[in-house]
A protein has these predicted regions:
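N-terminal Rossmann-like NAD(P) cofactor-binding subdomain of oxidoreductases
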Residues: 1-184
Length: 184
């Protein structure tokens, strides 16, 4: 958080023009910035890395513009998590518009790929379900304690990671005491 607090600017399309500490009250007294509008073309020499937290299917529009300025990117969307274009298009149902970068993207799981992440130009941050599934599986697979086709992942998640836009499926009165299948 100290690095975030020392940044010269921060961008949030949804909150452009609003004070950071008004949107994120826990930062009150620590940061004196307003959220700015994203101007990709003017990033140039201002930044070394962009942490891109945009919806899935949007990052692939921004990443080429950012990388063409030789700026490193950490992408929180799913757009670069898979390094195979055909697999991505099968799972997400859309064409990937920047497939040439997919094979060279580093999967941002530091417990597994720490050294590769350090030197990466594009890091695909893993999602919560893959992280929950991969981390406990690494030692049991490495030690050959289980057959790969015998692994069952039964993961549950709260609604806090579902984004800030209200939806019937994430509205607390509709979710409280309910279990909803994800991604079926």
């Amino acid at each position: 958080i100290q690095r975030f607090l020392s940044q010269p600017f921060t961008v949030a399309e949804t909150f452009t023009g609003q004070r950071v500490d008004r949107v994120l009250p826990n930062l009150r007294g620590f940061i004196d910035l307003d959220f700015e509008k994203l101007e990709i073309q003017s990033l140039g020499n201002q930044v070394d890395v962009v942490i891109l937290a945009v919806p899935h299917k949007v990052a692939m529009e921004f990443v080429p513009q950012i990388r063409n300025q030789d700026i490193r990117v950490i992408d929180f969307s799913a757009d670069y998590r898979l390094n195979n274009q055909l697999v991505y298009e099968k799972w997400y149902g859309i064409d990937h518009t920047d497939p040439s970068r997919m094979p060279n993207t580093i999967y941002g799981l530091p417990e597994r790929y720490r050294d590769l992440i350090r030197g990466a130009d594009l890091v695909a941050n893993p999602g919560c379900y893959p992280t929950t599934s991969i981390l406990p599986s690494i030692p049991i697979i490495s030690e050959q304690l289980v057959e790969l086709d015998q692994i069952i992942i039964d993961a549950k998640s709260g609604i806090s990671g579902a984004g800030s836009k209200p939806k019937d499926t994430t509205h607390y009165p509709n979710r409280e005491s309910n279990l909803v299948a994800y991604g079926l």
